[in-house]
Each structure stands twice: as structure tokens, then as C-alpha cells.
Amino acid sequence: MSHARLSVGSECWVSNNNGHWDAARLIEIKDNGGGKVVATVAKSSGVLETVNYQQLQNRNIGQSESPSDLTNLPYLNEPSVLHALHNRYNNKQIYTYSGIVLVSINPYQNLPEFYNDNLIKHFHKDPEAAKVPHLYSIASSCYHALTTDSKNQTIIVSGESGAGKTVAAKYIMRYLTSVQGVDHNGVVKRSVENQVLATNPIMEAFGNAKTIRNDNSSRFGKYVTISFDENLLITGANVNTYLLERSRVVSLLKGERNYHIFYQLITGCTEEQRDKWFLESASSFNYLSQGNCDEISGVDDSNDFTITCRALSTIGISESRQEDVFCLLAALLHLGNIEVCATRNEAQIQPGDGYLQKAALLLGVDSSTLAKWIVKRQLKTRSETIITSSTLEHAISIRDSVAKYLYSALFLWIVHMINASLDHNKVKRAAYKYIGVVDIYGFEHFEKNSMEQFCINYANEKLQQEFNKHVFKLEQEEYVKEGLDWRLIEYSDNQGCISLIEDKLGILSLLDEECRLPSGNHQSFLQKLNNQLPTKHSQFYKKSRFNDGSFMVKHYALDVSYQVHDFLAKNSDAIPDEFISLLQNSKNEFITYLLDFYMQLVSSQNKNPRKTAISRKPTLSSMFKSSLSQLMTTVSSTNVHYIRCIKPNEEKLPWTFSPPMVLSQLRACGVFETIRISSLGFPARFSYEEFAHRFRILLSSKEWEEDNKKLTLNIVNSVIPHDNLNFQVGRSKIFFRSNVIGNFEEAHRATCSKSTVLLQSAIRGFFTRKEYQRTVKFIIKLQSVIMGWLTRQRFEREKIERAAILIQAHWRSYIQRKRYLSLIKCAIVIQSIVRKNIAYSRYINELRESSATLLAKFWRAYNARKTFRGLKKSVIALQCVSRSVLTRRYLRRLQDSAGRTSILYEKQKNLQASITEVSKQLKSNSKKVTVLRNKLNILNNSLSKWKCLIKKPSDFSEPVSMDFTSNDEQLVQLLQAESKLRQASQQLYMAAKKSELGFVQSQTARENLSNYYQALQMTVSEKFEYDTEQLPSRVLFYAMDRYFSIHKKLKQLLELVGVENASLLPNEVVNKQTKDLLYEKRVVFLKQIKQALTVSSLFNAVGYKDGVMRLLETDQNSLLFAGVVNFLIFAGISLDLKTQISEFLSQLCSYFTKIVDGTVIENDKTLDFYEKPLQAVLYWFATLHKIRSFLVHLLSINSHGKQSVVEDLWNPLILKFSKHFSNLENSFHSLVQKLLSCCTEGSINALLNSKCLPEFIDAADENTTPTGMNIYELIDRMNLIHKLLISSALQPNLLELTISHMLQHIGQRAFQTLIHGRSPYTWKSASQVSYNASLLINWCHQKGISYVNSSLLPLMQSPLVFCLRKNDANDLDVILSVCNLLSPFEVVCLLNRYQPCAGENPLPKSFSKAVEALSCKYKQSGFTNGKITNTNGHAIPIAASKNPLLSLENNHIYEELRLSELINLLAKATL
């Protein structure tokens, strides 16, 4: 890169003493003659320096000094490239193009904003985004080339250790997998990124180590291919590895560590594994302690070991196989600790070496044989086999070779398992095209370079050769496309260096030949190199001038000197056949499998189409050459993209740029070589529009053309006229050779400088005129200010003189006045002191007297308050006692009134009976009077007829008068009887009125008394009903006792039916006849039990249909059905019918689930509507509880039994279904509570709104008609519910739990409504609530039910808040102390609901203020009422019954199941 012409004033770069470059400006050029030209330059620091003119390099200035593509630099030279990268790095631009190569400088900082999903979409969808240097631009170009050209693609990522190669490869794979979602609507076949990156912990553990330069350095290269199908969907991936650094297993430099897996194993294994593998600390092992670095800051090896184990499981390596891997690693560590000592010229191992025994045990070989082949070697001749002793150095080499051999085989096997987990074979069949990512080491050169650096640089030579071809191919294709006058040129190639390495008589061939010789050594190998290579490859091979055992190879990037000391050992890296035979016969199955795998893999990689007579072992160089050849074949068949990763500083500091280090890497990785190759052509190119826009200022505006191409040619001709060799015109672009564009930049700078000078002169004249005018104005203004200031000064002097005279006069008078006042003040002070003392003594006396008086007053007030509080408490207690006495007296009066009312009631009955009798007589007499009246009418009619017929009445006067007289007497008698009847009826009516009035009075008294008396009547009647209702259940529980007594015998008898070792039972369990009979019918009974173990047949036997059983009327059915089910379960377990029992219990759970789901609860229905569903649900609830109790009983039997096999067989099954039945039991309990809640709907109204005490009814409520259910109806409904619960044969604990939960629900809802409702309460209405709650508590006493936790006691105590006195704050304290079951917050809520009765005074203000203060106190403290909770929806733990239930009496169920014969037989046997 020669510099262009430099003139005085040009910017340039000058080399300093450190071999770096400083920015400078050319001041003077001087020709000293003899072709020696010197120049004087001024550095940026201002120092002048004289240097050789030829050493100066052109410097780019302005916008062109840090372009996005280094080939666009006007001057292409090392300092310009380095400065451009430095500027971009400081501006947080870590990516820069260098032709087709992307240079990436590691920022040593996480930059998520550089790689987010939006950026992926931007690079994928916008073609112009590829012009921006970025990892995604390379990946985008690669992906689009695959989609358009259908050609395989490869991205080569290279660089030093710690330069960011792995991270770059990771983000490239992330891009390639993420764009699948963009192209295919988010449907990605597999996340290859996650699968490949999931293997990173494994590859890092087994292939990474801490070096001097990097804490996590990859000591191998890899090539990851991502395969696509015809639809460009990702189908899989594959990982190929190259050149694992095997020597690191046995040797380390200071400050380095071995592979991470060894340290992870030591710190992360369990104590059991540590003892099993004889592991100690890392410092105790020879292979780990050489570097004196056991830990890395910020790295937790124990946690990494857990991650590694999890990753091994992910790729399909089982835990047992992982144990084998770790055992092998431990064996390698013990192998390195085997101490080989020298006796004269022979190596020897002590037989009692502990590490020898441990290594042999872990490897599965004989310790003596292992020690033998370490210190001995076997030589085969044609006639015999000779065993000779090895030297100390050779024995140690053999020991280390075995360790390296086994570790290399283990590493290749792990890579094979990773590829198997990625399903590579199937990928090859389904793949259409692929994109490969090569993460390979960059060019390496250290103070001492060995076999590893030689192979790495050999690989980089091959890649550089491919890169040279690729660059020239692309460049020349663009020249042809643009139609340039271009002849294809020859370009420099590094084939000579490659031939030096890989020819027949090259370095690798001579190395393999020396390794095959029995007496080969590194001195003879170096001699062969020096004898044969300098003549043929003198340009690339150079002998060492010193006899230091090294040779030099001139690589494309740098001349590297290699030490040949370890070349032969590292190249052969094989173990003797005796060791291979020893390990193949190992007792460790994994060792033999690993050796077979490794040998097959090596033989497959080294297949030679030409068959040779002698079978040769493959060497490291031959295997690496073969794999590198395959890689280059693969890469050459694809379209290649290059990324060079640069390490900016050695300390790994973020955003810190070290120019010397970056410069050495740029030279080593071939970036400058890339620029040199590009400069042979036309590296600088511009579109016509871009060139015209930038350089149009070189022409006057009159010469500007609308056609950009013409304008571009005019500009070019104005700068470099008649110079067609340095540029060419294409179809859409103009091309320039290297450094030509600098002339345009120089002309551009000169034009801008000339224009700037002209512009500056005009601007400076303008500003000078402005400054002059501003100065004149300022001078005029300053003069006026000064004149005014002088005038004011003269006036001030005159004013000061006058003021001085006045001040003197005042001062003299002030002095005299002050002297007089001081005398007066002294007199006053003396007087004040005297008076003060007198007043102070008087004050002290008065203070003592007032204090004594005040203390006496306070003491008397305290005694008075104390006495008053005592009296007040006594009065309150007395009031409570007197009120209770009065209440009891009132109760007795009501009882007496009720007695008198009963007497009146009996009298009323007698009067009603007499009234009824008299009414009957009255009706009969009325009928008689009617008959007589009819007869009278008939007689009157006949008389009138006779009067008309008799002409002479005197003839008939005597007989007629006699008849009339007789008839008239009868009529009079009838009328008299009728009047008597009417009088008697009137008397009876009046008596009935009086009796009715007395009955009304008695009824009123009865109603007053019924509030207290009815509870006693209910208690007596319900006690009788309870005693009678308990009779069937008592009979049932007596039957259960009988079942429990025969339980043990039944178990033994069933074991005789199904258990083969029945002879082991005691003889006294059952007699021989029963035993023989049961054993003979074993097969029949076994078949019957299997048929009975189906839920469908069982439910058909009991008449189950749609959740209802045909014998549901009695509670014996619950015991009967549960006993049959338990018997079948017990029989199935005894007969070892595990499958049938599992299906039977599963179907039983399904039936119970259907019953729960099929029960529909409807609101707003009567109690009769819920009676049958509640009875059915209670039946199934009791049945389910008995079945679950039996399963729990079986678990307790098995847990204390002696047959562990039976326990292990049945306990998991029983425990599983016991949990299922427990969940179903909770579901049934919740269903029962919902039904009970519907049955007790209206209970809140009954507790809070029932007005059962007429004396305590408010005036506002006298005319209101009560609505809803009252307290007596609620108690009747509770009685009916209690009957249903008793009839369901529930266990006592279930019965108490169910009723307690129902009372809890009623009490909580009523208490919440009382506190948070809207209706106000007086002391009378509160007394009604207290009475209603007492009736409900009394009902609990009658039934023997606990109500302590049912919220009834707080409800009972709440009315006291309304009834106690409320005059002042002390009364509030009394209320809080009396209502101890209520929190202060609840008391405040109740007091807010209080309303005085009609005619009562409102609450005093003092009491209201005390309530408000209490309320504010709890609001400020954030108090919330924690007492009122709702237990609905919580699963209540239900304890199983202690006694199981089995049904052994024959019934219709057993008859339906055809088990009657077995039941009868068992019943007889248990008698």
C-alpha cells in the first residue's frame, strides 16, 4: 500500500518508536540528494519531528476517515484502517465491512438492543439493510442467497480465543431460525437454535478450558450445519469438530486449567460418588495442579456440573451412562497420579501404589498388568516377541498417551451422541439445502509454538486460499457485469505454503514417516526437514539460525517458528497394542464399548481407496488433514461468507481499544491482505448519483449537468485529465483504483478550504463593522455615565459636609443624654433587684401553699372517682341482678296466668258442650213448633170452611166451642214452650259471649307465655321423638359390633380361599372340615368374586337407577350396601385380584362422581322439594364414608403387617383410591351443605326480624305485618333436618360436623347482616334478636350439639350493646368489657346502628364523641374485622371411622350376585 503524493499541509501518518502510528501534518519536504528525501511533520501533540519521507502514509480526514467499508477509504494503509476501526469502535459501532469480509470487534458487554427481534425483521425484509455492517446483514445475505440461488451457504467465523466467535455463531443461528416465523406465518418445524445451543454446556465442559488469554477458551473447532427442506423449513442440524487439544489433558502452563469437566466433577459430585471414585481436591491430582489455578472468579463449578448433567440427560445419555463417563474421568485423574520412578535406565512402579490400584479398579483392569505395560514395551520380530524395559521418559509418555487417547475417544463419543439427539441421519435424508457455520480458531503465534499451532495455522492457510479465490471471483464478476474493459488477472496464491505442508515430501508426510519408525525422534525429524524442504520450498521454509530445535514457516499472515520437541509424541498420540488389548478385555463395559466406537470411527475417517499391504495406524496429522480436506471440499462447494472476530484488549475491558493488539490480529487474520487483494482491482466504486452529489463542488455551478453520468465524467476530467488507467466507467457505477479517490478528496478539501477562506473574510468584515459600531455606541454611553457619576459625587460631598455638622450636634447631645440615662438606669436596677427579692420570696410561699392545696384536691378527686366507679359497678351489677329477678318474676306471673288460662279453657269447653246440647234441643223443639203451627193453620182453614157451611151456628156452637177450647189450650202451651226455649237460647248466647271473652283473654295470656313455655314443650316432645328415632340406628350399631368381632376370623378364612400358603395359619383359626371345604370350592368362589367385582352388576343388584335406590327408605340400606362393597374389596385383596379391584374401585368412583354431578339444586323451593334429594345425598355420603374408612383400615393393617411383598403390591393402589374417595367425600359434604343452605333459606329473617315478645315491640312496628319465616318455623325446619340426618345412618363425627357447619353458616350470615345491614335497631328489637338466638341455642342444648364455634354466642351478646346504658365514655368502656366476644370494631359498627325508642332521649354528645374517637383509632391503625369469616368453599378434613364395616349376613344383594353360598359358609365358619 504505497502512499499517494504528499504535499505541504497534507494530513499524514508517521511511525513512532513503538512500531505504531501517530497523526501528523506535513510541514516541509527537503531533498538531501542521493535519493534521500526527508520531511518535517507536526504531530497532534505539537511536537516537530524530521522523518524519512517514504515512511509517511496518507491520512484520511473528514467523513471518509471511518467508512462502513474499509475498501472505501481514500487511502488504503495500515494506520488508516486501524484508525477507522478505532473511531467506529469508540462510536459503539463494532461491525465494519472489509470488502466481503465483516470485521467484528468484541465489545465485552451484553448488547441486547443490537440483536432484538425487530432488528431481525428489519434486516430480513429490507434489502437495503444488508449494506449496514452487522451479523444479521451477513446472515440475511446468506439466507436470501439460499432462497434465490438454491445453493448451499457457509459462514466462516474466525478469530483469536476470546474474540467473540461463539457469540457471533449463536446470533447467526438465532437469525436463521427466527426468520422461519417471518416467512412461514410463525410456524417453525423445530427450534434448532434451542437444540444446538442446549449442547453448549456439554461442549464447554468437555472442550473448553481456562487459558492465559481466556477463561473459557474453546480448544477445538466446530462446523454446525443447519439443514432445510424443499419448503425452506429447518429440518435439523449436525455438529462436526476438529482438532481437540488433547495435550491439555496431561500438561498445563502456569495460570491455566484443564478441561472444565474435571473441576466440575470434583466440586459437584455427591459424597457417595466421591467415595465411590476416590476423588480428592483438585490440587491433589497431577493433571490438574500443574497450572496452580483451581478456580475461576465468578464461576461456580458445582452449579455448572448440575447444568452439565441436565444437558447430558437432554441429549439422551442416561444417568447410569453418565456414571460411567464420570468414572472414566476419575480413572484418568488417578492414572496421572501413578508415580513412575527410575532405577538406573529402567522405569518402575511400586506395586503398592494406591493410585495404581484405584485407576485399575475404575478402568476394570488388573493393576499388575496395567503397571507392567506402563514400564515395559513389546517389540515384535519375525520369529519372536521381545519385552524390554522402558525409560522413565517413555513410561510417562505411555501413561499420558493412554489418558489422552481415552479422553479423545470420550469427546468424540459425546459429539456423536449430540448428533444422534439432533437426528442427523434423518436430516440427511430430508435435507434439501443447508447453511453451515464454521466456528474455527484464528491464526495463532506464541513465543513457543507446537503441533496444535501448526495444525491451526495450516487450517487458516487453507481457508485463506479459499478466501483469495472467492474475493477475486466476486470482484471480477462485478467488473464483467458493469461492462468494464477488464482482463481476468492472475492473483497471488498461498499454494506454495500449503504444498510445503501437505505434499508427499512435505512437513506432514515427513512427520508421519518419522512417527512410523521405531527409533524416530524429533532431532532426526528436524534434520529431514532441513535437508529436503529448503531447496524446493525456499520461499516458505526457513531453517533456524540457532540449534534450538525449531523451524520457521512463512505463512500468509506472519512468519511463525515451531518447536519440534513434541511433534512426534502429539502426532502419533497412540497407545501400544498391549494397552488396547488390556482395555478391550476390561471388566468395565463402557470402556470396551468406547474403544470399539473410537476404533470404528477412526477407521471410517481414514479409508484409503488404494489398498496397501501394510495396515498403518492413523496419526493426528493424517486425521486432521482428512477432516480439513472434507471441510474445504464442503466449503468450496458452497457460497462462502466471512466474519473476522477481533479481540480489542487483553484485559477484556468493555469498550477499550488496544491498537497494537488489534493491529497484530488484523495482520494475522489477513484483513490487510484482503485489502491488498482488493486494491489490485478497482476497490473504490460509486454510483453516479453518489459521486456527483459528493464532488459536484469541484465544478462551478454553471457546469453542472442534469445527467449524473455526464456530471461525473466532467468532475473526473477536471481532477485527473487523460488518466484512463486509474478509473473505468461502468453501466451504473464508476470504478477507481486504490488511492485514486484520495486525489478527489484532496481537491474536495482544497475547494472547501478556498471557499471557507472567502466566506471567512466576508464574515470577519461583517463582524468587524458590527464590533466598531457597537464600540462607538459604548463609548458615548460610557462618557454620559462618567459625567453623571462626577456630578453625583460633587453633590454627595456637599451633602456629607452638611450631614457631618448635624451629626456632631446630635452626637454631643446624645453623649450628655446617655450619661444622664445611665445614672437613672443604675438607680432603677438597684430598686428592681430589691423588689425582685421581696416578690420572689412572696411567690415561693404562695407556690408552696397552692401546691399543697392542689395535691389535696387531686387526692380527694381521685378517692372520689375511685369510690364512684366502685359504686357505679356495684349499681350496674345490682341492676343486672334486679332486672334478672324481675324478669324471672314476670316469667312466673306469665306461667300462673297460663295455668288460670288452662282452667278457663276447660270451662269454655264445658260451656261449648252445653251450648251444643241446648242448640240441639232448640232445633228439635223448633221443628215441633213448626209442626204445631202447620196443624194450627189447617184447623183455621177448616174452621173457616165450617163457618161458611153452617147456616145456624147455634146448632153447632157447643161442640165447636169445645173443640176450639181444646185447640187453643194446646196452642198456648206451644207458645209458652217456644218462649222458654227462646229465653234459654238467649241465656246460652250470653254465657257463650262471656266464655268467648274469657277465652280471648286466656289466649292472650297463653301467647305471652308461649315464648318461654314452648321451648319446654318442644324439649319434652323432641326428647321422646329423639329416643324413639334412635332405636333403629342403635340396632344397626349393635350389628356393626358383631361384624367387628368376626373381622379377624373372616380375614383368615378368606386367605384360605385365595392364598397358597394357607397351611402356615394356626390350627385353632378354623377346623379342618371348614378348611377343606373352602379349599375345594376355591376355584368356584374365585370365579364368583371376579363376576361380582363389577359396579354395574352390584348396582343392578341393589336396584340403582338414576342415582336412586329402590330400598332407600331405611337407613339399614347404607350399612348393607357399604358392607357388601367392603366385603368385595376385602375378598378381592385376599384373593390377589389386583386388576379387578382397580377396575371396580375406578368404576365406583365414576358412579359416585355421576351422582354428584347429577344432583341439581334449584333455589326458591319449599322444604318438601329438597327432602328427597337431601335424603338421597345423605345416603350416598354415609355409604362413601364407610367405604373410605374401610380402605384406610386396610392401609393401617398393611403398614403394621409382616408381609412386605403384599404391602408393596397393594398399598399404592389402596392409597390412590383412598385419596379419590376422600375427594369425593369432600364433594358430597359440599353438596350436603348447599342443600342444607337452601333448606334454611330465610333463617336470617327468622333470627333478626321475628317479634315473639309483645312487650318488646316498638311502636313503629305495631301496625306492620311480619313477613317471611319466624323463629318457631326455623326451629321446626331444623328439627326436620335433624331427623333426616339421623335417619341417614351418618357416623357421629359426620353428623356433628354437618350440623355444626350449618349452624356456623346461619350464625355468620346473621351476624354479618346485623353488623353491616341498613336497618336501625332499638333496645327492644335487640331484645327480640337475643331471645331468638337463645331459642336456637336452647335447641342445640336439646340435641346435644356444640354451638361454641357457630357465631351464635357473638349474636347472643350483640343486643347487650343496644341495651346497656350509654351516657358517657365510661359507659363505652363498660360495654367493651361486658361484650368480650365482640371486637371494638364490631361494637362501633353496632353502636352506629343504634336508634333510640320513641320518647327516649338521643345519645349524649360525650358518648358519641367517645364512639367516634374509638372508630378513628381503628381506622388509623388499619384495623379490619378478622372474626367474621366464611368457611364456605373450603374442604373440611373428614376423619375416617376407626371400625371397618363388613356385611356377612345373607341378603338380596348377595342373592343377586350369586354369593349366598359363600356368605353362608363364611357365616358358619365364624360362629
Swiss-Prot record:
Renumbered residue ranges of the record's region Actin-binding: 628-650
Subcellular localization, as worded in the UniProt entry: Cytoplasm
Keyword Zinc-finger: no
Coiled-coil annotated residue ranges, if any: 909-952
Domain Myosin N-terminal SH3-like, chain residue ranges per copy: 7-61
Cellular component, GO, one term: myosin complex
Domain Dilute residues, every copy: 1171-1417
Presence of keyword Flavoprotein: no
Domain Myosin motor: 65-749
Family indicated by similarity: Belongs to the TRAFAC class myosin-kinesin ATPase superfamily. Myosin family.
Function: Involved in cytokinesis.
Descriptive protein name: Myosin-51
